[in-house]
Amino acid sequence: MKLFLSILLLFAGYASFSQTYISIAPSLTNTAGTLADKSNLSLEVGRQWDVFSMGFDIGKTTLSPVGAKDTSTYLEIRPNLNIFQEGKFTNTFTAGIGYIFGANESLLTEVTYGIEYAYTDRLHFNVDFGNYYYSGKLSSSNVTFFGVSAALYFGSFKSGSIITRETK
């Protein structure tokens, strides 16, 4: 019974002091090839707690056709930290880890820095840049990327004290 109550309280706290978001993020890498070869696209769904967020990202490492076996689709977990905020602008840091399905270099790690603009409480735009690192059994590689994203938050979240008291 104690375990059940602990888990219930954990989930209640998780839901009470956070907000859900969805983000779409096109980007370009510095790889050789056509514009489609260099283009990436990802969709992220996650939760934000004050300055920390955790998202699950599904995407494509290239928008070019890859042949009979798709080796460009990936799934990634992306923790994000809002480092500094001034007005509607925020400096962000993201470190992610994921898996590229069917690829020889299937381990994906990511380091990203961004500048986010809060257009409204629910709609944010981000310009980001960083590196993707790919690793496999016999080889590894990395690419630099530059991208933009738009995030929609499903509710506004105000950080502050759990208990508030009105003064007269």
Predicted regions and their residues:
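Gram-negative (and chloroplast) outer-membrane scaffold detector with strong preference
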Residues: G46-F125, L152
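Positively charged n-region of N-terminal signal peptides that target proteins for export
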Residues: M1-F4, Q19
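Short glycine/proline- and aromatic-enriched beta-strand/turn motifs that initiate or cap beta-hairpins
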Residues: S16-T62, G147-K158, K168
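Predominantly the C-terminal beta-signal and adjacent terminal strand-loop region
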Residues: A36, K60-T62, V66-G67, V111-K168
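Short hydrophobic/aromatic beta-strand or adjacent loop that forms the aromatic wall/cage
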Residues: N40-S42, S72-E76, V143-G147
